[in-house]
Amino acid sequence: MGLEVVVDEIKAKGDREAAAIKAAAEAQAKEIVNEANLRANEIRLAAEKDADTQADRIMIREVASANLVVKRDFLNAQKELLDKVYTSAAEEIANLPADVHAKAVRELLKESAKQIKAGVVFTNARDEKAAKEAISGLKTLSGFTFGGITDIAGGVVVQSTDGQLTLDFSYQTFMGEVWETSLKDASEILFG
């Protein structure tokens, strides 16, 4: 019986050690699972935060992009309207009575004579007669000749006889200068 007691003791000791090892393994496994769950939760929270941050960035980019599109469309609409105003003003000037154009040609030629002593005058077809009458009728224009028709809406283009100087007193030039200096005012009137 002594041997059986020793065997039972060894067996009991083995069972206790096995139970202790099993308990330690279960505790370690539980700790590993808990740590894994904590780490997984941290990763999930970080991923959610990153996704939220990226979503916010995308939203900010999309809103900024949409604002740029709206602003570009608004500026294009403003430009279209300003172009229509410019075209309308040019048409109104072109449709003025013939005597107004004749007077303008005469005055522009007088101004040309102050800057050029002799030159060649170019006008559009409508203003040809007025230019020829001014050249033949004004002493200050005795050094001027009519050079022909050019593609302008009105006014005159005068070139010095030596070709060194050209005065562009066309309606387009005057309108362009007025438009450039008044564009800001026109925009404020039209668009506030």
UniProtKB/Swiss-Prot annotation:
What keywords are annotated for this sequence in UniProt?
Answer: ATP synthesis, Cell membrane, Hydrogen ion transport, Ion transport, Membrane, Transport
The record gives the membrane topology as: Peripheral membrane protein
The keyword Ubl conjugation is annotated on this UniProt entry: no
InterPro entries registered for this protein in UniProt:
ATPase_E_C, ATPase_V1_Esu
Q: What GO terms fall under cellular component here?
A: plasma membrane; proton-transporting two-sector ATPase complex, catalytic domain
Q: Which family does it belong to?
A: Belongs to the V-ATPase E subunit family.
Q: What does this protein do?
A: Component of the A-type ATP synthase that produces ATP from ADP in the presence of a proton gradient across the membrane.
Q: What is the lineage of its organism?
A: Archaea, Methanobacteriati, Methanobacteriota, Stenosarchaea group, Methanomicrobia
Q: What is this protein called?
A: A-type ATP synthase subunit E
Kindly state the subunit structure of this protein.
Answer: Has multiple subunits with at least A(3), B(3), C, D, E, F, H, I and proteolipid K(x).
User: Could you cite one Gene Ontology molecular function of this protein?
Assistant: proton-transporting ATP synthase activity, rotational mechanism
Q: Which gene produces this protein?
A: atpE
**Gene Ontology biological process terms, A to Z:** proton motive force-driven plasma membrane ATP synthesis
Q: Which organism is it from?
A: Methanocorpusculum labreanum (strain ATCC 43576 / DSM 4855 / Z)
Compartments, as annotated in UniProt:
Cell membrane
